[in-house]
């Protein structure tokens, strides 16, 4: 009788609480695995626990001083009588792993991100990033940009773009929450410094015919809510975290999607989510965004006048694009799953 085949993912967060970002990518990757392969997801959490996430067995290792010791102990036990493939998204977990990482997915280079904020430990991050690549058999990048900005200098890599689980989520039909007379602008972002939310607040201030709704949470949400309140703006709302069904409803009903960033956009998932719903997406001309956007006319400089003019010009021209076809041809679940299927077939031989 042959050994069990197991794929073990390393991530960051509890996927039942944090449902976007890296967790989405791991879910998409896992769907390409054959049915006979067992799936595990490991992360550092608030306590030691086990639970199921779809068909993936999740292992939370308590975030304490002994977490890396417990990680290696668990893996040694799990892989003792099985063929294990370790697919990591977490630099630190791979760095302290005694085994080699089979596949390492790069969302943003560790040194690149720390350099953008001039982090005081950026040289330590540089060392960690290089060490992880040396310990990885194959490196997967989610865009050409992430490859170019990484410290990886070998040839054993692959580029596979992201897709979105929203494709399989049913739209939740609810009462309309928009002012039907205004141009409806929607965005899904983590509320942090790099996403340039100030630009949307400026846009709301400049043009009262725009109604802007932002889905997402983050460390600066109360700061920006206070700013909106102090400026007495009633045409922009930070809605906080929304379930996927509601997000699909807002995408479906909006006129425009924006994806703004100062840096650190290794792919730009909300761009393809906008295209899934056949919406025009205006996004910052930074990072990986230019290689994902349908046409450069939708790229904006991080300037409120440029952003406003681009939107108004598009609405006047009413030029026709098949955004949905662009999504399904380049980023659809089936297209991306097929690429991961070929990757895992090669790795699991």
Language-model features: locations:
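Nucleotide-activated donor-binding/catalytic signature segment of Leloir-type glycosyltransferases, i.e.
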Residues: 225-242
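Membrane-proximal helix-turn-helix segments that form the acceptor-binding/catalytic region
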Residues: 121-139, 152
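Short alpha-helical donor nucleotide-sugar binding micro-motif in glycosyltransferases
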Residues: 241-242, 249-254
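Conserved acidic donor-binding segment of nucleotide-sugar-dependent glycosyltransferases
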Residues: 295-305, 312-318
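A charged, aromatic-enriched C-terminal amphipathic alpha-helix characteristic of glycosyltransferases
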Residues: 316-348
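Short His-centered aromatic/hydrophobic patch
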Residues: 87-93, 106
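Short hydrophobic beta-strand element within catalytic cores of glycosyltransferases
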Residues: 271, 280-283
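Conserved donor-binding/catalytic core segment of Leloir-type glycosyltransferases
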Residues: 8-9, 140, 177-195, 201-204, ...
